[in-house]
Amino acid sequence: MKKETITAAAVLCALGAGFLACVLHTDQPLSLSERRPLAQRPEVSVQALASGNYMSEFETYALDQFPLREAMRQLKAQVQYYLLRQKDNNGVYQVDGSLSKIEAVLSESSVRAAAEKLNRLQETYLTDSRVFYGVVPDKNYYLAEENGYPHLDYERMDAILAEGLPHMERIDLYDCLSAEDYYKTDPHWRQEELEKAAGRVAQALGVSIAPFSDYTQETYQDFRGAYYGQSALPLKAEPLHYLTSEALEACTVHHYETGADTGVYETEKLAGKDPYDVFLGGADALETITNPNAKTDRELLVFRDSFGSSLAPLLVQDYQSVTLIDLRYVSAQLLEQFIDFHGQDVLFLYSPSVY
């Protein structure tokens, strides 16, 4: 009887402690590790109660705002990885401390559709331009196959693009990179490791890049990338480096959406939810880097995804301006309202997830 009383008291104490923690816990607006907003307490109404929506929304809210939620996510991930020996958690796997996300299914129809879209852009705006395209290899290209993980059929993707883009010149970047050239906790490549890749792009375009020895390397020490939160593993932060020089400091970036003019690096973004946004301020539909000290009067248009943010500053040396266009955020039909197409060099540069 005494043992049962002690057990019951322990259970009641645990429940009481849990209830007290929930009461005292302050609701958080977002999860920094997952980089997403958290559900907030739903409003009570007769309509919401009658429809059942309130309980459904409250369940989501309770799961998001559970006081020990982050600790439980980490515990689950460690059990799956290290105790149960599962090869991934939430689709994220780990090889020698580097995280990557499984992407195994190549949508050939999507690749063909992307090629058709690029062709339409070339026919509409770029008939007087030299046009190049390249694929930014994802980290899986260097990690997945040799470590037993499924991966995209990169050769098939390249073949579809080559067939679909007959009037563009391909820039091959696969042999310019390795797994070590990417952040351990993020899908993006590391700017300080792009000398070979940037040189390959510049060579194709017929321009030069500044030697990396000319740059000063600035460092943010507390970078935790997108895969850090998705994996839920308690990994150490890693450094994020960005390259500066007097030439880059003289450049300005015009953001068409806001009308703001900034520097190439927006260092205040380092304190935000995604420090990678330090490169050109992060996601932006349309922006132009102006270089007052350019060695030529040439101009470059880069149709890109987020990988282009850290590469573009390395290409400005010979260009009077470099305009970056992200078609995920602006319709191609609106481009001529902002850009005077007159034979600029053109580069389409996307990672496999966009193609």
Question: What is the meaning of each model-derived region?
Answer:
Residues 1-355:
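Extracellular glycan-modifying ectodomains
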